[in-house]
């Protein structure tokens, strides 16, 4: 008898599963399914098949529901499926709930300044050109390749990629684009900086590490998007078929002066003179999900939560709108092949800072030390 009941229960479970995933219109089966899976939407007798696609590797288990940000859902058809099939992209406001930029309270930044900045000279504004783009200076590109911080798994490492993206380019500028072009390792910084991690960090975590210990090139420790221990092997290592080992002699990339710069004209002078800079922005879900190209504007007042690198500026010929040229770290599939443009503070007769996610309020520069490279 027990065996028959077990077989009957198994049969009902199989039928229920088939009905749930093949939209079988059977009221009795729906009742069975509701007992097993819970009730359906009241507006539909059979719930359309949904796949939950997580867009943030985020563990909610240790948080109360009161601390959670709203969940934004976007529903679209699955390619190649029936009309009733839908994919539900569960999009948490990751930058509001867990920003990849973490500003620690009462932290003292160890800025280094041994010579005046370009924007500290009287009358510097007169020499600022109308347009500047380090991707194309007289036909020469000084910018390093675009990266994706979110592969092979999600990692809140924008603080690394925004900072090193600008710094890679500055090494190329300082060395006049001579071979080899610079590509420092974000993973080594995550492993060995001592502060930031895949749960977030700060520009200072990168530049203080570069000043004190020096950075290593990408081939020393390829990006894995995880938190690892700082070992000699994770500093710079390699492997043979039968063993792995730490490399003893490798190039280190140091910086000299580093500090903060704010404001449109100061930023322009710093960028034109020495190369791209790292800037914080208050990234919004709309920017994250909807930007595909063009000059971005959005009125918002979010706290800074993301780091990007600003490589130049320009003016739209049709609208005469001035914009920043910015590299993100979400891969080439996002935006304008991984880049975006956003209005400067001149937008709407000087109201642009309300529409550009605060990109001009908190930026950082670092001057490469190339004395050991050439």
Task: For the regions a language model picked out, list residue spans one by one.
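Cleavable N-terminal signal peptides of Sec/SRP-targeted secreted and luminal proteins
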Residues: 3-19
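Catalytic-core signature of thiol
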Residues: 16-63, 67-374
């Amino acid at each position: 008898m027990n065996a028959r009941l077990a077989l009957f229960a198994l049969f009902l479970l199989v039928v229920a599963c088939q009905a749930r995933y093949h939209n079988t219109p059977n009221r009795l089966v729906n009742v069975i399914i509701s007992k097993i899976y819970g009730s359906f939407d009241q507006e539909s007798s059979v719930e359309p098949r949904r796949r939950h696609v997580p867009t943030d590797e985020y563990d909610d288990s240790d948080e109360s529901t009161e601390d959670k940000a709203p969940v934004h859902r976007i529903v679209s058809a699955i390619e190649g499926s029936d009309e009733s099939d839908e994919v539900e992209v569960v999009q948490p406001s990751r930058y509001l709930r867990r920003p990849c930029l973490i500003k620690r309270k009462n932290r003292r930044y160890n800025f280094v300044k041994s010579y005046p900045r370009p924007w500290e000279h009287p009358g510097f504004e007169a020499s600022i050109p109308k347009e500047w783009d380090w991707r194309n200076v007289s036909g020469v590109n000084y910018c390093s390749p675009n990266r994706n911080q979110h592969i092979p798994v999600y990692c809140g490492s924008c603080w690394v990629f925004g900072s090193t993206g600008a710094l890679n380019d500055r090494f190329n500028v300082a060395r006049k684009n001579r071979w080899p072009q610079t590509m420092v390792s974000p993973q080594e910084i995550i492993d060995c900086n001592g502060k930031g991690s895949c749960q977030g960090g700060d520009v200072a975590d990168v530049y203080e590490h570069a000043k004190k210990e020096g950075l290593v090139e990408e081939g020393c420790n390829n990006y894995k998007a995880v938190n690892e221990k700082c070992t000699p092997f994770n500093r710079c290592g390699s492997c043979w078929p039968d063993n792995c080992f730490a490399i003893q002699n490798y190039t280190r990339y140091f910086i000299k002066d580093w500090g903060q710069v704010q404001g449109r004209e100061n930023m322009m002078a710093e960028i034109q003179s020495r190369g791209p800079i790292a800037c914080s922005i208050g990234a919004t879900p709309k920017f994250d999900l909807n930007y595909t190209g063009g000059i971005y504007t959005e009125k918002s007042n979010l706290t800074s939560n993301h780091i990007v690198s600003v490589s130049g500026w320009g003016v739209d010929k049709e609208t005469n709108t001035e914009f920043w040229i910015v590299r993100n770290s979400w891969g080439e599939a996002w935006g304008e092949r991984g880049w975006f443009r956003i209005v400067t503070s001149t937008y709407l007769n000087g109201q642009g800072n309300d529409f550009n996610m605060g990109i001009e309020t908190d930026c950082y520069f670092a001057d490469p030390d190339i004395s050991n490279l050439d």
